[in-house]
A protein has these predicted regions:
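Short Cys/His-rich zinc-binding micro-motifs
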Residues: 1-3, 49, 150-156
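C-terminal accessory/binding modules appended to enzymatic or scaffolding proteins
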Residues: 125-134, 139
Length: 178
């Protein structure tokens, strides 16, 4: 989180004594996630939140609602919004589940995106998408996922996964558009 050439590593972590011990569970999404039943859709939520807030949408009255309140409505328009919001979650926290139990995932090309959060005036994590494997320091692979966020600030309690600690830490890599 202190590189002078962010988002690239310049070795500063060694000079600062950074301890990057991995603390994230290697349990699968299915093992971590709770099931939330709507009227006509089911959403799986594993609580790994990077605080990107794509799970919120503005309703017809101009008020912000979250995916959980929209899911409870259960009408066609709401179901469409729930699918969109769940698919937009870069952390992969939220997934709509089909009637057969399959997680409905968006088709994403492999890539890694540096995320900034101008609304909170902080730099966020790395959005990894398109089923890019994640290997732990000991060589064990995490479950292959379509979407996840990696910590960049170095302060996550779920390393290497982003847990939104960058927000209270006011992490700034020097590239936030203000």
């Amino acid at each position: 989180g202190h590189s002078s050439s962010a988002p690239f590593c310049d070795g500063t972590h060694k000079k600062r004594g950074f301890v990057g011990a991995e603390t994230a569970s290697t349990d699968t999404f299915d093992q971590r996630a709770e099931t939330i039943e709507g009227k006509s859709l089911t959403v799986r939520d594993d609580k790994r939140c990077a605080f990107v807030r794509f799970c919120h949408a503005e309703n017809a009255q101009g008020e912000r609602e979250n995916i959980w309140s929209i899911l409870a409505k259960g009408d066609v328009a709401s179901d469409s919004t729930v699918r969109e919001l769940a698919s937009a979650c870069p952390a992969g926290r939220l997934n709509v589940q089909s009637e057969s139990g399959e997680l409905l995932e968006p088709e994403l090309k492999p890539g890694i995106t540096v995320v900034q959060d101008p609304e909170q005036a902080v730099s966020a994590g790395l959005y990894v998408h398109g089923y890019i494997p994640l290997e732990s320091a000991d060589g064990e692979e995490y479950e292959l996922r379509n979407r996840y966020m990696l910590c960049r600030c170095g302060l996550s309690r779920e390393k290497p996964i982003c847990d939104a600690t960058h927000v209270p830490a006011a992490f700034d890599d020097g590239h936030i558009e203000k």
